[in-house]
Amino acid sequence: MSVIKMTDLDLAGKRVLIRADLNVPVKDGKVTSDARIRASLPTIEAALKQGAKVMVTSHLGRPTEGEYNEEFSLKPVVDYLKEKLSAPVSLAKDYLNGVDVNAGELVVLENVRFNKGEKKDDETLSKQYAALCDVFVMDAFGTAHRAQASTHGVAKFADIACAGPLLSAELEALGKALDKPERPMVAIVGGSKVSTKLTVLDSLSKIADQLIVGGGIANTFIAAEGHSVGRSLYEADLVDDAKKLMEKCDIPVPTDVRVATEFSETAPAVLKSANDIKDDEQVLDIGDVTAERLAEILKNAKTILWNGPVGVFEFPNFRKGTEVIAKAIADSDAFSIAGGGDTLAAIDLFDIADKISYISTGGGAFLEFVEGKKLPAVAMLEERAKQ
């Protein structure tokens, strides 16, 4: 995957526009989780250090496109950046006709979704973004799967379009896990529905030596083995797809499970064999024997890709399966990459972030990359690198 990298360029005196992912939760005008901004800081600092005239922009939330709405303003992000950076930081509201920015300064360009045509990858808007800079830096992996004006269109028209350090690292880590993985390669796919992850499962079944399934997805596989799953979340119409996947790839289906008669945080967990699920029960976690068997598989892996918990880990009574898996990944010597919102929440809960080789910042983009799809923003950077 050949793209121009920001780290290979001399940015001194250049107008640099960084498309970051600063889409953070905000409450009462304050940033409540700064993980994405923290991840973007080294890119911004590197450009400032080189003496560039730095602009950074992002989307935040889902405002009505083309309308300013203070609720979705990047002002809380600007306040946060002012605390963290020694350089001057300001917010520009109207910037499409030009921005005054000095070397060593940072101007945050207001929420891109306030601009009409952003989501449709409008050519006029893309050219306006491109005219603001000498170098465009795409550093928002989380939006790389969307062809929008600030992620894709601008890269087409900017004098130079390159990948920022975050995006470069993300692509390298995913390439290491998927293109030429060290074997055995084990993939874990959790989540509620097979239907939303069918392409991912299919794609990984061709790469992985073993494919671990969890959550509601595992219930469809338990049903495919001929067991009743009671009132569990599962997809009867995808049982045949599950059977086909089991023929193609080694999928260790849970042999014991934790069930409850209601979906509730206080419901007591009952541990039982997977062939003994009653009609009024629902599976909410894998059982101890299954968890230990999967931990052993992970212990021997050389590459691990983790997407999704294996149970309803938000409920303390149904947390154990995901905890055992998380600890096994943390203790493994394998190259491990994890991605997806629920996965990141589990990593935080069990405090293992420093034990995972690479944590992906992109939810949808991570899944589309794993599915083998071309990410439009990355494809455009590759295109520009050839010119």
From Swiss-Prot:
GO biological process: gluconeogenesis; glycolytic process
Keyword Signal appears in the UniProt entry: no
Pathway(s) per entry: Carbohydrate degradation; glycolysis; pyruvate from D-glyceraldehyde 3-phosphate: step 2/5
EC id: 2.7.2.3
GO CC annotations, alphabetized: cytosol
PROSITE patterns: PGLYCERATE_KINASE
Compartments reported by the entry: Cytoplasm
Binding site for ATP: K197, E314, G340, G341, D342, T343
InterPro entries hit by this protein: Phosphoglycerate_kinase, Phosphoglycerate_kinase_CS, Phosphoglycerate_kinase_N, Phosphoglycerate_kinase_sf
GO molecular function, one term: phosphoglycerate kinase activity
Catalytically driven reaction(s): (2R)-3-phosphoglycerate + ATP = (2R)-3-phospho-glyceroyl phosphate + ADP
SUPFAM superfamilies xrefs: Phosphoglycerate kinase
UniProt enzyme class: transferase
Binding annotation for substrate: D21, L22, N23, R36, H59, L60, G61, R62, R113, R146
The keyword Cell cycle belongs to this UniProt entry's keyword annotation: no
Keywords assigned: ATP-binding, Cytoplasm, Glycolysis, Kinase, Nucleotide-binding, Transferase
Subunit (UniProt): Monomer.
Family: Belongs to the phosphoglycerate kinase family.
Protein name from the UniProt record: Phosphoglycerate kinase
Organism field: Proteus mirabilis (strain HI4320)
Lineage start: Bacteria, Pseudomonadati, Pseudomonadota, Gammaproteobacteria, Enterobacterales
